[in-house]
């Protein structure tokens, strides 16, 4: 088989399964609206949970940072790319979340890959929730450690793995809020079991940070848990991009020595770190935005419970409506788009086979009438 045949067959498999991914060009998007071509859509596919991507103070901080520091960092943080804005942001994050250290990464994907591959050796094991993000599962699979997955959000399933012998160290991996189902992990139970077995817990709280807890401190704070490793990302509630790993001092120093994604990647622009400091202030002061988001979630769930579709058991901004069939999910997504609503159909392999869905995400930027319009069109599709 030639390279051309290999590529052609791989593409055809996705088409045959109604799982072919495409990108849509848009002219601008935020928590509420998306502009594509000549049309404006109500945006129910964004992770901009607090609407901060268009916040005036955040934008001004980026602009001021760019004028002061330029538009790029100029190198790895180990060479010339680590500036005062980076150091200040790391300290502010550590103080806010109650850890000695924070390390910045260019993305949550990079952070997860770096931590799992740098910390583990061949005699270690990684025990991961089956529905953990692709970045976690891929990093675990590529790490030298043995990977075992436990049933989603089932502490007893984790316990069955923890009691098995391991020559090295155990790292348990989960998410605070799961990106496709919107449900939350039982973090207190997972941490208790992990600690009792002498292991460490890593929580990726990409979809919980900024949204849950006092000052938006996230899922771990809400559940009274401090994992050994906390990954927070800035592409959701913060309205920007990038990530940070929160940990103890020796762990941070170890990652600085061994985390290749830190050592060999250009650091985020200092201007971005300036904008993230402004976004952090907005998150900390964002109780009104979080309350507004919760109101939109309750409004949607109360009415969506009467739809003839399976509504996920989510109390978060991620509200999946299970369709099952790949093609049907695409048809409904197109019909919603024709009605001026941007809703994304999520299909395997992103989610398990037979669980194609409309993944609806809500934002504090949405207005009550936006939710009413979405529900009106959904009712029309189902009846």
UniProtKB/Swiss-Prot annotation:
EC number: 2.3.1.47
Record bears the keyword Transferase: yes
Protein name as catalogued: 8-amino-7-oxononanoate synthase
Pathway: Cofactor biosynthesis; biotin biosynthesis
Domain of life, source organism: Bacteria
Binding site for pyridoxal 5'-phosphate: 108-109, 179, 207, 233
One family name in Pfam for this protein: Aminotran_1_2
């Amino acid at each position: 088989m030639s390279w051309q045949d290999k590529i052609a067959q791989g593409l055809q498999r996705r088409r045959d399964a109604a799982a072919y991914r495409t990108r849509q060009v848009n002219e601008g998007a935020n928590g509420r609206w998306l502009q594509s071509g000549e049309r404006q859509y109500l945006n129910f596919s964004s992770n901009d949970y607090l609407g901060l991507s268009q916040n005036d103070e955040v934008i001004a901080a980026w602009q001021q940072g760019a004028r002061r520091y330029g538009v790029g960092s100029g190198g790895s943080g180990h060479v010339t790319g680590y500036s005062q804005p980076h150091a200040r942001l790391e300290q502010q994050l550590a103080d806010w979340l109650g850890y000695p250290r924070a390390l910045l990464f260019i993305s949550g994907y990079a952070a997860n890959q770096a931590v799992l591959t740098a910390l583990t050796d061949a005699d270690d094991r990684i025990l991961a929730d089956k529905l953990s993000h692709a970045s976690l599962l891929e990093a675990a699979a590529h790490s030298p450690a043995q990977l075992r997955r436990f049933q989603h959000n089932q502490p007893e399933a984790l316990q069955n793995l923890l009691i098995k012998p391991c020559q090295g160290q155990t790292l348990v991996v989960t998410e605070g809020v799961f990106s496709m189902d919107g449900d939350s992990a039982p973090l207190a139970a997972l941490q208790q079991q992990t600690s009792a077995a002498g292991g460490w817990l890593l929580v990726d709280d990409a979809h919980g940070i900024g949204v849950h807890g006092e000052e938006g401190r996230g899922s771990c704070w809400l559940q009274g848990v401090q994992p050994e490793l906390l990954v927070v990302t800035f592409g959701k509630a913060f309205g920007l991009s990038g990530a940070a790993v929160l940990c103890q001092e020796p762990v941070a120093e170890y990652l600085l020595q061994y985390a290749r994604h830190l050592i060999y990647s250009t650091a985020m622009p200092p201007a971005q770190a300036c904008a993230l400091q402004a976004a952090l202030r907005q998150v900390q002061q964002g109780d009104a935005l979080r309350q507004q988001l919760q109101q939109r979630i309750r409004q949607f769930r109360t009415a969506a419970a009467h739809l003839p579709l399976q509504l996920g058991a989510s109390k978060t901004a991620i509200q999946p409506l299970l369709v099952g069939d790949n093609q049907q999910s695409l048809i409904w997504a197109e019909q919603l788009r024709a009605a001026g609503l941007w809703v994304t159909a999520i299909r395997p392999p992103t989610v398990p086979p037979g669980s194609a869905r409309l993944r609806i995400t809500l934002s504090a930027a949405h207005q009550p009438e936006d939710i009413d319009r979405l529900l009106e069109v959904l009712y029309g599709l189902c009846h």
